[in-house]
Amino acid sequence: MNIHEYQGKAVLRSYGVSVPNGKVAFTVEEAVEAAKELGTDVCVVKAQIHAGGRGKAGGVKVAKNLDEVRTYAESILGTTLVTHQTGPEGKEVKRLLIEEGCDIKKEYYVGLVLDRATSQVVLMASEEGGTEIEEVAEKTPEKIFKEYIDPAVGLQGFQARRIAFNINIPKELVGQAVKFMMGLYRAFIEKDCSIAEINPLVTTGEGKVMALDAKLNFDSNALYRHKDILELRDLDEEDSKEIEASKYDLNYIPLDGNIGCMVNGAGLAMATMDIIKHYHGDPANFLDVGGGATAEKVTEAFKIILSDKNVKGIFVNIFGGIMKCDVIAEGVIEATKQVGLELPLVVRLEGTNVELGKKILNESGLNIVAAESMADGAQKIVSLVG
């Protein structure tokens, strides 16, 4: 789960991480009032969406008086920002962060991520702050420094100091930088983050080390023990189809293709997408109905797939282990009738009660194309959608 920058900064502040003072605003008048309350000569007006690259897209403006705050708030609120992370459709700006300006001396990057290769949390840092870390990794990887953290003891002070020296934090500010990184690590662990990224971390003319931006992502599987974080969820920033899928315990991820996929099991779902690509098709989604799908779940899965206007055909690929093929067949028939399906539908069933499942489909009188194997099904649906 993602949260907004201003929410991330509030979380970090509770762990002793230094962040600029700021207030969230949902209207132009609230933005002006927030700037008045901050009482600083310079304010930064920042669009709040779940995506990076806001500055380049015109979503971050420096205001030197209240009139400029009003002008920038009017120009940003309600507009659609398109960045490299939003996709071409962009995201509508519905809230702003009004923040005090900083006398920036130098920008850095600091982040905590999970390294799956070593099964450890890794602290990464670079003195090339303010730019995409992926770009730094590609062009100048030698400028990225890493410290792998032993989960038994956590981030150690000497590791944070080594990072601070490696990225050339001024000596007089190393202590602050170490405190910053230790607080960031505590937040990462205690809040079950999957990413905690500060880009940029800055040193200021007043001799402070601060987080000028904050990106925190949380492990959705751990949200049951973080009710405070769950309350920060902004459904406006999430895909409506993903939200609907989560209500029925369906795992849905939208893609850019035109072949809808309904599969049970994440591994089979990925294999299904691979084989569709192999036969020169393009999957429109990843949709895992899980091991205990009911007729109701299958119907909802169909509705979610069909809500994507790019879908030109559907491939149902089910291996019946816990799930029985006859139950799936009945669900497919019920769903087809309910939604009035007119698109090509290819169904491949294998496993428990497979013959009964095929018999139910064959006797349904509906225009359902049966497939004998996954490869056969993929070829048929690719052919049908043209």
From Swiss-Prot:
<keyword id="KW-0067">ATP-binding</keyword>
<dbReference type="GO" id="GO:0005524">
    <property type="term" value="F:ATP binding"/>
</dbReference>
<dbReference type="GO" id="GO:0004776">
    <property type="term" value="F:succinate-CoA ligase (GDP-forming) activity"/>
</dbReference>
<dbReference type="Pfam" id="PF08442">
    <property type="entry name" value="ATP-grasp_2"/>
</dbReference>
<feature type="binding site">
    <location>
        <begin position="53"/>
        <end position="55"/>
    </location>
    <ligand>
        <name>ATP</name>
    </ligand>
</feature>
<feature type="binding site">
    <location>
        <position position="99"/>
    </location>
    <ligand>
        <name>ATP</name>
    </ligand>
</feature>
<dbReference type="GO" id="GO:0004775">
    <property type="term" value="F:succinate-CoA ligase (ADP-forming) activity"/>
</dbReference>
<feature type="binding site">
    <location>
        <position position="213"/>
    </location>
    <ligand>
        <name>Mg(2+)</name>
    </ligand>
</feature>
<keyword id="KW-0460">Magnesium</keyword>
<comment type="similarity">
    <text>Belongs to the succinate/malate CoA ligase beta subunit family.</text>
</comment>
<dbReference type="GO" id="GO:0006099">
    <property type="term" value="P:tricarboxylic acid cycle"/>
</dbReference>
<dbReference type="Pfam" id="PF00549">
    <property type="entry name" value="Ligase_CoA"/>
</dbReference>
<keyword id="KW-0547">Nucleotide-binding</keyword>
<feature type="binding site">
    <location>
        <position position="107"/>
    </location>
    <ligand>
        <name>ATP</name>
    </ligand>
</feature>
<comment type="function">
    <text>Succinyl-CoA synthetase functions in the citric acid cycle (TCA), coupling the hydrolysis of succinyl-CoA to the synthesis of either ATP or GTP and thus represents the only step of substrate-level phosphorylation in the TCA. The beta subunit provides nucleotide specificity of the enzyme and binds the substrate succinate, while the binding sites for coenzyme A and phosphate are found in the alpha subunit.</text>
</comment>
<dbReference type="GO" id="GO:0005829">
    <property type="term" value="C:cytosol"/>
</dbReference>
<comment type="pathway">
    <text>Carbohydrate metabolism; tricarboxylic acid cycle; succinate from succinyl-CoA (ligase route): step 1/1.</text>
</comment>
<feature type="binding site">
    <location>
        <begin position="321"/>
        <end position="323"/>
    </location>
    <ligand>
        <name>substrate</name>
    </ligand>
</feature>
<feature type="domain" description="ATP-grasp">
    <location>
        <begin position="9"/>
        <end position="244"/>
    </location>
</feature>
<dbReference type="InterPro" id="IPR005809">
    <property type="entry name" value="Succ_CoA_ligase-like_bsu"/>
</dbReference>
<feature type="binding site">
    <location>
        <position position="46"/>
    </location>
    <ligand>
        <name>ATP</name>
    </ligand>
</feature>
<keyword id="KW-0436">Ligase</keyword>
<keyword id="KW-0816">Tricarboxylic acid cycle</keyword>
<feature type="binding site">
    <location>
        <position position="102"/>
    </location>
    <ligand>
        <name>ATP</name>
    </ligand>
</feature>
<feature type="binding site">
    <location>
        <position position="264"/>
    </location>
    <ligand>
        <name>substrate</name>
    </ligand>
</feature>
<feature type="binding site">
    <location>
        <position position="199"/>
    </location>
    <ligand>
        <name>Mg(2+)</name>
    </ligand>
</feature>
<dbReference type="InterPro" id="IPR013815">
    <property type="entry name" value="ATP_grasp_subdomain_1"/>
</dbReference>
<dbReference type="GO" id="GO:0000287">
    <property type="term" value="F:magnesium ion binding"/>
</dbReference>
<dbReference type="InterPro" id="IPR011761">
    <property type="entry name" value="ATP-grasp"/>
</dbReference>
<protein>
    <recommendedName>
        <fullName>Succinate--CoA ligase [ADP-forming] subunit beta</fullName>
        <ecNumber>6.2.1.5</ecNumber>
    </recommendedName>
</protein>
<dbReference type="InterPro" id="IPR005811">
    <property type="entry name" value="SUCC_ACL_C"/>
</dbReference>
<keyword id="KW-0479">Metal-binding</keyword>
<dbReference type="GO" id="GO:0042709">
    <property type="term" value="C:succinate-CoA ligase complex"/>
</dbReference>
<dbReference type="InterPro" id="IPR016102">
    <property type="entry name" value="Succinyl-CoA_synth-like"/>
</dbReference>
<dbReference type="InterPro" id="IPR013650">
    <property type="entry name" value="ATP-grasp_succ-CoA_synth-type"/>
</dbReference>
<dbReference type="GO" id="GO:0006104">
    <property type="term" value="P:succinyl-CoA metabolic process"/>
</dbReference>
<comment type="subunit">
    <text>Heterotetramer of two alpha and two beta subunits.</text>
</comment>
